[in-house]
């Protein structure tokens, strides 16, 4: 029986010829001329039970395993750490009114040190003001902070661990919040 025919029989696509015995390339390990009379008289038991599967039968239910839970989350879990200002030390808000883009470093250093910054861009031309807002947006993204537009060309930059109270935000909008540093 050829390889293709054996594969078809194995997959159930063809029936095996019972009267055809393929003994090509078969070596039973006995020496030539060895006479084993018992092997010649005892039939070899073969299980040739073939069962047709009925499409109407219910599938056999496999035992279910409990769902596997990962040891750690699959991805980063965003968490915002907020220190309530009233319960900790009072924070200071720095107000900076840059006149050119060259003063961006001072804004970045104050914010990086954990100080909320009011960035007042009213004295800047629109091109430099836009560049400074872009800088602040990158700063906020990189240090996981928050930015709010207070009024036209005035922004509040809050570090990730500081929450500016609504009272202070209202004072900033009204223009009565001055540099507390």
From Swiss-Prot:
<keyword id="KW-0963">Cytoplasm</keyword>
<comment type="function">
    <text>Cell division protein that is part of the divisome complex and is recruited early to the Z-ring. Probably stimulates Z-ring formation, perhaps through the cross-linking of FtsZ protofilaments. Its function overlaps with FtsA.</text>
</comment>
<feature type="compositionally biased region" description="Acidic residues">
    <location>
        <begin position="18"/>
        <end position="27"/>
    </location>
</feature>
<dbReference type="GO" id="GO:0043093">
    <property type="term" value="P:FtsZ-dependent cytokinesis"/>
</dbReference>
<dbReference type="InterPro" id="IPR038594">
    <property type="entry name" value="SepF-like_sf"/>
</dbReference>
<feature type="compositionally biased region" description="Basic and acidic residues">
    <location>
        <begin position="28"/>
        <end position="42"/>
    </location>
</feature>
<feature type="region of interest" description="Disordered">
    <location>
        <begin position="18"/>
        <end position="42"/>
    </location>
</feature>
<dbReference type="GO" id="GO:0005737">
    <property type="term" value="C:cytoplasm"/>
</dbReference>
<keyword id="KW-0131">Cell cycle</keyword>
<dbReference type="GO" id="GO:0000917">
    <property type="term" value="P:division septum assembly"/>
</dbReference>
<protein>
    <recommendedName>
        <fullName>Cell division protein SepF</fullName>
    </recommendedName>
</protein>
<dbReference type="Pfam" id="PF04472">
    <property type="entry name" value="SepF"/>
</dbReference>
<comment type="similarity">
    <text>Belongs to the SepF family.</text>
</comment>
<dbReference type="InterPro" id="IPR007561">
    <property type="entry name" value="Cell_div_SepF/SepF-rel"/>
</dbReference>
<dbReference type="InterPro" id="IPR023052">
    <property type="entry name" value="Cell_div_SepF"/>
</dbReference>
<comment type="subunit">
    <text>Homodimer. Interacts with FtsZ.</text>
</comment>
<keyword id="KW-0717">Septation</keyword>
<keyword id="KW-0132">Cell division</keyword>
